Amino acid sequence: SGFSTLVRLKEKEDPTVGRVMEWVKTNRTLASQIDSARVVMESMASEITPCAEVVYKGQAIDKNKFSVIPLGDPHIGLQTWSKEVGHDWDLKIAKRVYKKVFTRLLARSPDTEECVLLNTGDFFHADNIAGETSASAHKLDLDGRPSKWLEVGFQVMQMFIEMCLTKYKSVKFYNVPGNHDDILGAALGVFASILYEKNPRIEVFKGQSPFQYFHKNKVLLGFAHGHKCKLGALPGKMADDQYIMWGNSTHRHWITGHVHHNQWIQYKEWSGASVESVGIIPPKDAYAYGGGFGGRRGTQLIVFDDRVGEWDRKRESVLETD
């Protein structure tokens, strides 16, 4: 913070003050930057032409069951080199692999009337033209320019949503904020809400809150990225945020991302709720590979019965042929 002054050059004999303008410099918080960016994004998104209504081709069998598809940290824009980390990955590969894996997953999953499509955060790998995260300014391994990440990212988002709209009668898209893409992640939710505003079968939760909830009959689900709140504190957070839903439910569960692997060792039943983290499809970047982080690459679909909780779970792994 401080002052900046614009001055006018003057002759030595000129008695007038040379100051033309003075303004205060401030250190804006990340939150205020994101709020400003959201206003700009909503203005830009207003120019988007909403797409035509997607045709439903599914066969809903049991209205008591619903499907939840967690998109574990897609990291669109990530680039890796096989000689360094064991696998090649870029925008072109990401688009191809996501389509193949998601197609196989939906083909072997049961038809339910309702689907919850969940972005667990970090949909984009970086957040600005410098190729960094906005919150921590971490330098990242990236493929191409920001406009390319946006284009491919929105195409992948559209593919996920429209495949779900084709299979399920009702779709809810939850966009959870991550730690890699504070601004571009917010853009994803804004653009999706406008793109599908003429599709009455989808409801878009744009992602203003780091903690989001879905409630149906006796099941209460919580969604978070997992970088701000320790897993053990999430059940209490759910009870505090949604005390009415908490009291009306008997099966309560959190789904998080961030750690890039299925946390079955830490899949625990805390007081009143269970918590898990889901794996991801992209390979490890150089930082994660060097640190020995990460896990098996793949995704999953969880079927819940609104009377008894989790009913079934389908897994789909990334194949070498993908």
What are these regions (language model features)?
Residues V54-K57, I61-P74, S82, H87-I202:
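Core catalytic region of metal-dependent phosphoesterases/phosphodiesterases
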Residues V7-T16, Q158-N175, R252-H261:
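N-terminal short leaders/motifs
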Residues T16, L184-A186, Y213-N217, A286:
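Short, solvent-exposed polar/charged micro-motifs at secondary-structure junctions
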Residues S1-K92, K99, A107-D111:
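Acidic, histidine-bearing metal-coordination/catalytic regions of metal-dependent phosphoesterases
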Residues L165, I194-R201, Q208, H215-G222, ...:
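Conserved beta-sheet core of the metallophosphoesterase superfamily
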Residues H75-I76, F124, H180-D182, K228-C229, ...:
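Short, solvent-exposed loop/turn segments at secondary-structure junctions
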Residues P177, G207-F211:
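Gly/Pro-rich turn-and-neighbor structural signature
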